[in-house]
Amino acid sequence: MSVVDRISAWARKKSPWLIHFNTGACNACDIEVLATLTPHYDVERFGIQLKGSPRHADVLVCSGPITMQQKERLKTIYDQMPEPKFVVAVGTCACSGGVFNGCYCVEGGIDASIPVDMYVPGCPAKPEAIIDGMVKLLKVFDKDKKKSEGRSQNGKRSE
């Protein structure tokens, strides 16, 4: 791993940047996600910042169930994010489809469309739970860094 890659991995671990996407929620979880980003909770002390572009984000925070209308948009946003990328499902609807599961226009939770790394249940999920999930995700960042350091360019473990 080159010096630039190591610095990039360290910076990414220390300061994950988020993009938030509502896939069809009632907006209760959106209010809680945005409340988490206010000075009252001060998540910037963990280096967490909200970004406006998926090309600059490490973590995709999703709220709401997957609707047919939003499914392709979600995949597009996910594909635009640089590697390594992580997905957090916030709220019961994002985790499992919630009360909307079984509706004609709902396909289920976020994991019905893209892989999810962290689930934060709740209706709505409280800011404290979202922060707890993000702190646990920071540990995944560290494991991902260690895993990538132990692998060569072709994906096999280096000797």
Predicted regions and their residues:
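Iron-sulfur-associated redox domains of electron-transfer enzymes in respiratory
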Residues: 1-149, 157-159
